[in-house]
């Protein structure tokens, strides 16, 4: 009964997403957020002891080997090229969970503990997050694609990075962890061109648009590929949900002149926006945001709906106002240590792992749509106010966004204009497809 209820809640959530949670920059208030979302106590879809939030219950994944079970069919070769997803956000989220369920079932044919090669991957986010679910699913895909030979152990909540989130990429580069999941914007100067995706002037409507645009931009721009290549071997780079401007306050904003004090935002365009409105940049790891907002240290927050849901930032006493426009989504990346990747190539598993990385990962990236629905639902259910900018305020914001884009282009070298133009072209194209 509990499992049936959990599945029903997910289906309610994804249907509600289509009805009330479109793109953040659409100018339409999110007046009817979903009534339900993934329960906070429920483990991620592919993590140990999870109840699979998919339309149909799935067999246990690689973390639950079954004695005497009929082996599932090995993973099929990955389809070539970028997949086509549903135009409707609710259907995309539903399909993504179904895809994860299939990966889990394929992985159940193999025992992770018997894998010949075991590697570690550090993730800043908790298990109960889109990032956690996404990475557990990728680990399942790798286990199945290598026929049980390679297992990637996902260390959520910085389990393998004692130095904290800001050290994740360096931990991977130095060989202290084999793979990493992180945000390029945490590392100022490491991959400046990749931060083009964060420009709010692009008007990214949702996670699916951001993810497809970021990945396609990376594939088409050698200058961006070169930035990442100096740090490790690329598995996948995409973008998260759009970010509202959130705060603990007592009224709606009506002008950019009211945006003052300390704002937590990532490197690149987000911090340029903070400069543009005359506020102060306040840096801290995402795990420290909850107390810093509660205690009034942070006045405003630029972070995505997924993080609002995963880190419980909509709890009473934390955030309660959400300016519903995209101040900027952030890039995500999964990379391998260069020496580790050479070892994987030597052992003959590089092609198998790459077959379930990159384009293939786009098949389940839309689980972030579900977490946006949860973030919005949490906000309203806890008494928060989600509102769009209107009139002169909307015009002021657009001017600020345009100024940020021009500054970003001027400060990022000869390739910046071409990278920005390509990113804008992709965003416009995918905005027309994925609502």
Describe the residue ranges of each PLM region.
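Positively charged n-region of N-terminal signal peptides that target proteins for export
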Residues: 1-7
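C-terminal motif of bacterial Sec signal peptides marking the signal peptidase cleavage site
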Residues: 16-20
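N-terminal secretory/targeting leader peptides
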Residues: 81-204, 234-435
């Amino acid at each position: 009964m509990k499992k049936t209820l959990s599945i029903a809640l997910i289906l309610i959530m994804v249907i509600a997403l289509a009805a009330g949670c479109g793109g953040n920059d659409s100018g339409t208030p999110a007046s009817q957020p979903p009534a339900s979302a993934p329960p906070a106590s429920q483990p991620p879809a592919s993590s140990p002891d999870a109840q699979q939030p998919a339309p149909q219950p799935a067999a246990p994944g690689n973390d639950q080997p079954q004695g005497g079970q009929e082996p599932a069919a090995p993973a099929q070769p990955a389809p070539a090229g970028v997949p086509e997803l549903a135009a409707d956000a609710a259907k995309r989220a539903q399909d993504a969970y179904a895809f994860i369920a299939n990966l889990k079932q394929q992985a159940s044919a193999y025992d992770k503990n018997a894998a010949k090669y075991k590697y570690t991957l550090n993730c800043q986010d908790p298990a109960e997050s889109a990032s956690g679910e996404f990475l557990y699913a990728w680990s399942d895909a790798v286990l199945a694609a290598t026929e049980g030979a390679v297992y990637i152990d996902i260390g959520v909540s910085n389990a393998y990075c004692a130095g904290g989130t800001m050290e994740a990429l360096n931990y991977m580069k130095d060989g202290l962890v084999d793979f990493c999941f992180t945000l390029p914007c945490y590392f100022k100067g490491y991959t400046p061109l990749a931060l083009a995706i964060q420009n709010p002037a692009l008007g990214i409507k949702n996670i699916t648009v951001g993810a497809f645009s970021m990945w396609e931009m990376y594939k088409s721009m050698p200058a961006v590929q070169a930035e990442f290549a100096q740090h490790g071997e690329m598995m996948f780079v995409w973008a998260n949900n759009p970010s509202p401007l959130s705060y603990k306050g007592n009224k709606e904003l009506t002008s950019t002149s009211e945006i003052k004090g300390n704002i937590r935002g990532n490197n690149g365009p987000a911090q340029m926006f903070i400069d543009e409105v005359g506020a102060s940049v306040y840096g801290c790891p995402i795990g420290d945001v909850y107390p810093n907002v509660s205690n009034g240290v942070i006045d405003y927050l630029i972070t995505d709906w997924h993080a609002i849901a995963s880190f419980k930032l909509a709890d009473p006493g934390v955030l309660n106002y959400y300016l519903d426009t995209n101040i900027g989504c952030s890039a995500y990346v999964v990379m391998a240590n260069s020496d580790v990747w050479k070892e994987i190539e030597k052992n003959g598993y590089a092609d198998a792992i790459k077959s379930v990385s990159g384009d293939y990962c786009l098949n389940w990236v839309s689980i972030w749509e579900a977490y946006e629905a949860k973030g919005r639902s949490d906000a309203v259910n806890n008494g928060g106010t989600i509102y769009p900018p209107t009139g002169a305020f909307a015009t002021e914001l657009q001017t600020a966004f345009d100024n940020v884009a021009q500054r970003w282009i001027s400060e990022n070298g000869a390739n910046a204009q071409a990278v920005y133009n390509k990113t804008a072209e992709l965003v416009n194209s995918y905005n027309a497809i994925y609502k």
